[in-house]
Regions:
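Alpha-helical transmembrane segments of multi-pass membrane transport proteins
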Residues: 1-415
C-alpha cells in the first residue's frame, strides 16, 4: 500500500519528535516499523509475518556487516586514548613556545593544537571542551579579548568535522556508497586551508588591533632553540608521527581505513603508555565511550535504513524528487538550496541526525544535476562546521560555556 501523503506525515512526525528530544535511533525504528506495518499490511498474514519485521532484521545485519562502519569504533578508540594520554597540555605549551614570535601567538597555538588534535581524534565536543579548559583561561589571563578567545576555541574545535579522520565523513561515505579514502583525500586540503585562514585572520587582527591579542611578556618567550626542539620532540613529534602514519597509510593505499584505524588505535595505546598515563581506569573509560558512541551510530543506521525503506515504499522519496526536479533548478541553485537547508538543520540538530536522516533525501538527486557526491560531502562537512559556530544554536559555544569561567557570558561567546 503506497501513499505519499502518509510518507510526508511520517517525516513530519519524525522532525517533531526529534525537536522535542526523543531518542533519534529508536524514533526512526519505531516510525519505520509502525508505518511499515501499515504499508506492508495484508489481512491474511499473522502479525509477525509482516514484511516490515524482515526488513528490520535484514537492515540490522547489513549495517553490522558494513566494512566502512568497522573503522568508526577503531578511530573513536584512537581518539579517546589520545585524549587520555594527557598530551594536550604539553602539546599546547610546546606550540605556544615554538610560535612565540608570531603575533597573537597564544591564539595561533590554540588553533594549531586544535587542528592537530582534531586530526588525532575527529571528535568535535572533546576538542572544544579540552581546549576550553586549557587554552581559553590562558588567553583571558594574557589579556585577550573574550570574544576572540572564544571564537578561536570554538572554530578550532569544529575542525574535527572536516579534517580526516573525521567520523562524519565515514558516516557520509557509508550513506552515499562512496570511498572513504576519496572523501579523506578530498577533505584534507580544505580542512587545513580553513585552519590556515583562521590563523591568518588571528595574525592580521593581532597586527592591526594588538589590544585584542596582546604580545606575551618577554619572560614567557625567552627560550633557547634547543629547549624548544626538546619540548616539540616530547609532545608534537610523537603525535604527528601517529597521525601521518594513519593518514599516510590511507592516502597512499597501503592500508584500508579500517586497517589504518586499527594501527592508529594501537599507536594511541602505545602513546598513552609512553606518557605514563595508561591506566586501567583510562582504558576502561576509553573503551566505554567507544562502545557507547559506536552503538549510537550503528543503531542510527539501522533506524535510518528502516525508516528510509518504508518512506521510499510509501512514495515519499519519489514525491520529493519529482517536486524538486519539477522546479527546473540549475545545478548551482540546487546546490545552494540544499546546502542552505542543511545549514539551518545544523542549528538544532547533531551532525549524526543530519547525515543519516536528511542528507539521503538529496543524494538520489545528485546524478540528475551532475553533482559529484564527493564535492557534495565536503560541502556538507564545511557547511555543518559553519552551522555549529553560528548563533543562535551554535553547539560549540554551548560546549565552551560548559567549561568556561563563570564570569564569561554566553552572549560574549556568541559575539
Amino acid at each position: 500500500m503506497t501513499d505519499p501523503v502518509v510518507a510526508l506525515v511520517m517525516l513530519g512526525i519524525l522532525v517533531s519528535t526529534i525537536m522535542i528530544g526523543f531518542p533519534v535511533a529508536f524514533t526512526l525504528m519505531a516510525l519505520g516499523v509502525g508505518f511499515g506495518y501499515y504499508a506492508y499490511f495484508q489481512p491474511d498474514q499473522a502479525f509477525f509475518d509482516n514484511r516490515v519485521f524482515y526488513l528490520l532484521t535484514q537492515n540490522t545485519f547489513t549495517v553490522m556487516n558494513n566494512d566502512a562502519l568497522v573503522s568508526i569504533p577503531l578511530f573513536l578508540l584512537m581518539g579517546y586514548m589520545v585524549e587520555r594520554a594527557n598530551i594536550l597540555d604539553s602539546l599546547f605549551g610546546s606550540l605556544q613556545v615554538a610560535l612565540r614570535a608570531v603575533p597573537g601567538s597564544l591564539a595561533v597555538a590554540t588553533l594549531a593544537t586544535c587542528a592537530l588534535f582534531a586530526t588525532a581524534t575527529g571528535i568535535v565536543g572533546a576538542v572544544v571542551t579540552l581546549m576550553g579548559l586549557l587554552a581559553f583561561p590562558q588567553m583571558l589571563k594574557a589579556g585577550y579579548d573574550t570574544r576572540l578567545a572564544a571564537g578561536v576555541v570554538c572554530a578550532g574545535g569544529c575542525l574535527g568535522i572536516l579534517i580526516p579522520p573525521s567520523i562524519m565523513l565515514i558516516v557520509y561515505g557509508a550513506q552515499a556508497s562512496i570511498s572513504v579514502v576519496k572523501l579523506y583525500a578530498a577533505a584534507l586540503l580544505p580542512g587545513f586551508l580553513l585552519a590556515g585562514l583562521y590563523i591568518a585572520y588571528v595574525v592580521g587582527l593581532a597586527v592591526f588591533k594588538p589590544a585584542r591579542a596582546p604580545a606575551l611578556p618577554k619572560e614567557r618567550t625567552d627560550f633557547a632553540f634547543g629547549q624548544v626542539l626538546l619540548m616539540l620532540a616530547k609532545s608534537f613529534f610523537p603525535l604527528a608521527i601517529l597521525i601521518l602514519s594513519v593518514l599516510g597509510a590511507i592516502m597512499f593505499g597501503i592500508a584500508t581505513p579500517t586497517e589504518a584505524a586499527a594501527v592508529g588505535a594501537f599507536g594511541a595505546v602505545v602513546l598513552a603508555a609512553g606518557y605514563r598515563s595508561l591506566t586501567w581506569q583510562s582504558v576502561r573509560e576509553a573503551v566505554y565511550l567507544t562502545a557507547r558512541t559506536s552503538a549510537m551510530v550503528c543503531w542510527l543506521f539501522v533506524g535510518s535504513a528502516t525508516f528510509a525503506s518504508v518512506f521510499a515504499y510509501l512514495g515519499g522519496e519519489g514525491l520529493i524528487k519529482s517536486t524538486v526536479l519539477g522546479m527546473n533548478l540549475s545545478p548551482i541553485t540546487f546546490l545552494l538550496l540544499s546546502q542552505f537547508i542543511i545549514f539551518l538543520l545544523g542549528w538544532p540538530l547533531e551532525w549524526t541526525e543530519i547525515i543519516i536522516i536528511f542528507v539521503p533525501i538529496f543524494l538520489p538527486m545528485l546524478p540528475h544535476f551532475q553533482i559529484d557526491p564527493l564535492l557534495f560531502g565536503v560541502l556538507v562537512a564545511l557547511n555543518l562546521q559553519t552551522a555549529f559556530l553560528s548563533p543562535p544554536m551554535a553547539m560549540s559555544a554551548y560546549y565552551l560555556k560548559g567549561v568556561a569561567p563563570k564570569h564569561v557570558l554566553l552572549t560574549q561567546i556568541f559575539g
